[in-house]
Amino acid sequence: MVRSLLPLSWRRCASDSSNSSTNDDIIVDYDGPDLPLPEYPNRPNEPLGMRKQRLLYQSRKRGMLENDLLLSTFAHKYLKDFDEDETAIYDELINGVSNDWDIYYWATGVKPTPPQYETDIMELLKQHVKNTEKVARFRQPELTYYL
């Protein structure tokens, strides 16, 4: 039996399988114009070292190779020196945005960065993406722990 935890505004329909006498197969369809995205959970009591560890890992596992390379090399180079506020801004940047392509387009200058993400950290990321030092970035750096 499938139990839905979705809001009531979602429409649930049982599959039309003639072989099944139960409603085990559920198709979920959203009626609204935009799919609501869950908010990223705030972690107010997370120690700074653990937060940096999490962000270092999350910078490596973005779901698209372009951001994996850009963000993992960025985090490897700068994250260890971020204070608590800068770390929170970076956390919001990589986890508050629902689409990794947005981060990529903003960092590469293809699209303008929205005002809420136009921060010193974003500017640092944009400079990192320009790669004025001509560093070869063909693979992610080794994991480094900050605890």
Swiss-Prot record:
List the SUPFAM superfamilies: YgfY-like
Where does this protein chiefly localize? mitochondrion
Q: Does the keyword rRNA processing apply?
A: no
List where the protein spans the membrane.
none
Q: Which biological process annotations from GO are given for this protein? A: copper ion homeostasis; mitochondrial electron transport, succinate to ubiquinone; mitochondrial respiratory chain complex II assembly; protein-FAD linkage; tricarboxylic acid cycle
Instruction: Kindly state one GO CC term assigned in the UniProt record.
Output: mitochondrion
On the tree of life, the source organism's domain of life is: Eukaryota
State the compartments where it is located. Mitochondrion matrix
Q: Which UniProt keywords apply?
A: Chaperone, Mitochondrion
Q: Which Pfam families match?
A: Sdh5 (PF03937)
**What else is on record for this protein?**
This protein may be expected to contain an N-terminal transit peptide but none has been predicted.
Q: How does it assemble?
A: Interacts with the flavoprotein subunit within the SDH catalytic dimer.
Q: Which family does it belong to?
A: Belongs to the SDHAF2 family.
- What does the UniProt record say this protein does? Plays an essential role in the assembly of succinate dehydrogenase (SDH), an enzyme complex (also referred to as respiratory complex II) that is a component of both the tricarboxylic acid (TCA) cycle and the mitochondrial electron transport chain, and which couples the oxidation of succinate to fumarate with the reduction of ubiquinone (coenzyme Q) to ubiquinol. Required for flavinylation (covalent attachment of FAD) of the flavoprotein subunit of the SDH catalytic dimer.
Q: What is this protein called?
A: Succinate dehydrogenase assembly factor 2, mitochondrial
Q: Which organism is it from?
A: Drosophila grimshawi (Hawaiian fruit fly)
